[in-house]
Each structure stands twice: as structure tokens, then as C-alpha cells.
Amino acid sequence: AKSESKAPFIAIIPGFQRSKEALSNIAIELSRRGYVVALIDPYAQGLSSSSLSTRAATTQGYGMFALVEHVYDGAFNFVDIDKIGATGHSMGGNAAIRGADFFGKQAIQNNTKSKLDSVYVSGYVLTLRNNILRDSKSNMGVSYALYDEGAFRNELTAWDSANMMIAPESLRTVNGVLPKAEQIKKVELGKYYGSKEKNSLRVIFNEPVLHPFQPYNFEATSNQLDYFEKVFGAPNPINSYNQIWHWKEIFTLINMVLALIMLIPIARLFLGLRFFSSIKKDVPAPLNALNKKGKIIFWSIFFISALIACVTFIPMVEIAKILFADAASRKLTWFFPQRMNNSVMLWAAFNGLVGIIIFSLSYKLFGKKNGVDPKSWGLGINRM
């Protein structure tokens, strides 16, 4: 993109508790096709700061609203400000819906075109309500996984809950831009309704995948690429099934596996250096094999500990809401601000304490009498 040949701009917003790397695949594919792409960390996620608002999705789009305003005000002379879009998955999809509503209201108030020309909503339909859709002045594509495990929250129940052909959420999205005489009772998936020129274009997709796999699915990615090709026109047109993002994921996986494999060889290499020679120790003698009683105790402790871990998680979630009330209500606070991680922290601390108690009791009641040497635990530290 250059100032002489401006390109459409697309903001990408990841889902809940995700950093920008989670949607790098769609960023790669959109940028290959010549769009200007900004992949952000939502507020309070990744490297982004927190928001003072407890309604960061509605009022700020998790940071997307400010970005759209910044771009629209001419911060980048190579961006076509008449072609600004947003896309996101899950919580990021909600941000896209909220963006269509926010900038739509702004356009109505100022009697202007919406700054957010088009949005693509992936994996989220809970806020596709009349009070939000009615003010939208953006083209809108909706993609929802047919086997989305969160569909139980939708308006329909059972198997129909994720069926976007008959879902009230998708019907409202489409019928809201159609004349009363042309309104439909069943959505034709992949069909474009409305008018691009009037910013009322609508399309619904319903890919047969699970919610977390939707951003990593060739069909879902292709549908999104086709949508932006339809509303903006790609500066560098490429077939939507010509995708390379999976190579990045494959090599990232290989990199992770190799990093784990290399831990022991690299540790041995460092231990061969003179600087680390003082920490080398002889391999201790193996412990005696467990007898029948020892095996019973071992497996009993294993299953009891696992059971305690299972049944204590939900209570720890409830306790976290009480101990960290500000964080639980999304208020910005210095006192343990990560509301989702606070529950895990309490659960881990409680089960760690239970584990220490069980471990100590098993040693005192059984291990000590059967030749278990505490030195074999590797907990002792000698002064240099």
C-alpha cells in the first residue's frame, strides 16, 4: 500500500484470554492479499494495558474503537479510510458486533457514513440482538461453528442451538436489512443479502467445526477471505483456498518439540563446562522396588489427590469471587487483577498444600519405616 494506491484497513481482535498470536493466521492471509492489517492484544490481554471500564467490549471494543478512530483520522496515508473493517473470533467477534453498533450510532447522530465500513463476526452470536443490530451501518458477515460447544447459551436449544439456518440470531441479522415483504424464515448459508452500497450486506456461514478450531480451519478462513474480497476488493487477489498459515503453525510446533528435546542435551553440555562442574553429583542409588502394600498406598494417594483436585476447582472459583471482588467484577485493581487466573491460583495453592500434607503423612506413616531416605528427594541445599 502507498499513498498513491491506498488499501483497505482491517483490525483483528482475538478472543477471551488470548494474545494477538492466536489470530496471526488470518492476519497472514489478509496481508498476503494486500490489506493493511492491525492485529491487536485486547485490553488486559497480551501486552495491552487494562481498561478502566467494566464494559470494555460495549464502550471500547477491547481497544478496537480507538484504533479505528486513529486510522480514520488519517494516521496512515496509505489507508483508504472509506474501507475500514474489523474482524474477531469469540470475544473478538463480540467486539466487531459492538463496533458496528457504536460507529453506526455515531454515523446516525452525525448524518455521515459509518467509519467502520464492514465487520466479520466469528464464533459469537449472543449480541446479535435487535437493540444492537438496528443501528448498524456496517456490512456484516457472521461465521458460527456448527458444533460450537458454547451454543447452549444461544436462543435455540439442543441440536438446533448452533444451526445458523434457523437460529433467531442469524435471522435477525439478515431480516433487519430486508423489506418486510422479502424477509425470510430460513437463511441460505453463504448467500449475500442486502446491499454493499448501502452498507447493509449480510452473509451467514456455519462451518462444521468446534469453536476453538474455527480460526484454524481452511473453510472458515476461506469464507472470511471471500467476504472481505466481496466488500472491499483485495488489492492483491489470491484464491481464498490458497493459504499458507498452516506452515507457520507446523514449524512453530516443530520448534516447540525441538526446544523440549534439546533440554537434556543442552543441560549435559553446560554441566561439562568448568563453571558448572561444582553442581555435578553422582546419580543416587535407585529406591527399592515397591512391594504390594507400597503399590496400594501409591495408587490410593494418586486417586485421592486427583479426586480432591477435581472436586475443589469450582469451590475455588466461588471463593476467588469473594476474595478478589474487584477483579471478579472487571474493575481495574492492583490486588490480583487477573480474574480468570485467580481461581486457578487458589486451586493450585490449596491442592499444593493438600499434596504436602498427604506426602508428609505417607512418609511418616509408611516411607520412614520402609527405608525411604529424604536425601533421595533432592530437596537439600549445601552451602558452597
Please describe what each predicted stretch is:
Residues V257-F303:
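Juxtamembrane interface at the cytosolic side of transmembrane helices
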Residues A1-W245:
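Soluble extramembrane regions of membrane proteins in the secretory/endomembrane system
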Residues A181-Y192, F276-L287, Y363-W377:
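Cytoplasmic juxtamembrane interface segments
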Residues N239-F251, A289-N291, A328-L346:
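Membrane-interface segments at the starts/ends of alpha-helical transmembrane spans
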Residues L225, E229, P235, L269-F275, ...:
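Membrane-helix interface motif
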Residues I244-N255, N288-L307, G378-R383:
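Alpha-helical transmembrane segments and their helix-start/interface "positive-inside/aromatic belt" motifs
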Residues S300-M384:
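Alpha-helical transmembrane segments of integral membrane proteins
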